[in-house]
């Protein structure tokens, strides 16, 4: 039960921090007023802080064996003040506090990036040493930031294409899709390269034996889901996006908007599945034994 709760907390925290950064970043190159809502960013930052506290308590309980708050408190202090994980946690809480106090898009993007990057200290990179530790953390952080930019853009587009779409809103959607093209290409490249690097850091240049354990099975599902996401992203980029642009000229935008909505919703669902798998994978060893 504790392991399941840990995975659920990790999933919720990952989703929250990915979106704090991703939505704020998307809002910088989009004119969607929803993404400029300060209560939205504040609420997500507060949620992230609460999830971070819950995650720290759960981790400390598992490591110390204590269940009563009075007995657990010294261990919590030691965790925060004397470990790298605790330092990353404190940095995350500070960054989230900045989002609450200054929820503008630029402050939220920068602070959200710091909060999201702190999750790297909860992954497999924390077990490395020396230069290997540095490069593993760098790869993890870039992977997280690219994933956050992607997830935030997907949710933003889903929100934009939901509900009744008039001519003005359609132009905003088409403009947002156009602006996301170059960002999306950079995101896909970063996620792909750092994903391969992270596999090499964790498992090494081998496949034998890895796929026969839970870790390997989940990783295979993750790679398959990512491949389908790439297909959908290519469909959006080379077919549905241009189709939406053409619909602005001929006035027949309903079919194009619905097709884009279906594709983006499917892509978002796959992204959520991947985050759930990542939350689970972070608790497992790649060794099938």
Placement of each model-derived feature along the sequence:
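Polytopic transmembrane helical bundles with strong interfacial aromatic enrichment
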Residues: 1-289
């Amino acid at each position: 039960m504790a392991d399941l709760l840990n995975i659920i907390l990790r999933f919720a925290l990952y989703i929250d921090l990915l979106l704090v950064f991703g939505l704020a970043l998307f809002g910088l190159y989009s004119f969607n007023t929803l993404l400029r809502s300060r209560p939205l960013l504040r609420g997500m930052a507060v949620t992230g802080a609460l999830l971070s506290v819950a995650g720290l308590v759960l981790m400390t309980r598992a490591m110390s064996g204590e269940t009563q708050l009075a007995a657990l408190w010294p261990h919590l202090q030691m965790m925060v003040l004397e470990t790298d994980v605790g330092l990353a946690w404190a940095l995350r809480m500070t960054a989230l506090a900045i989002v609450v106090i200054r929820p503008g898009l630029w402050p939220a993007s920068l602070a959200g990036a710091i909060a999201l990057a702190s999750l790297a200290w909860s992954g497999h990179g924390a077990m490395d040493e020396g230069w290997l530790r540095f490069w593993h953390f760098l790869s993890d952080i870039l992977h997280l930031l690219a994933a956050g930019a992607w997830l935030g853009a997907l949710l933003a587009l889903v929100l934009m294409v939901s509900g009744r779409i008039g001519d003005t809103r359609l132009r905003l959607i088409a403009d947002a899709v156009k602006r996301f093209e170059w960002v999306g290409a950079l995101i896909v490249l970063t996620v792909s390269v750092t994903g391969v690097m992270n596999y090499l850091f964790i498992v090494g240049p081998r496949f034998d034996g890895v796929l026969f354990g839970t870790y390997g099975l989940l990783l295979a599902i993750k790679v398959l889901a990512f491949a389908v996401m790439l297909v959908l992203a290519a469909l959006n980029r080379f077919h549905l996006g241009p189709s939406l642009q053409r619909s602005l000229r001929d006035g027949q935008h309903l079919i194009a908007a619905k097709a884009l909505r279906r594709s983006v919703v499917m892509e978002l669902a796959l992204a959520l599945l991947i985050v759930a798998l990542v939350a689970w994978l972070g608790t497992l060893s790649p060794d099938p034994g």
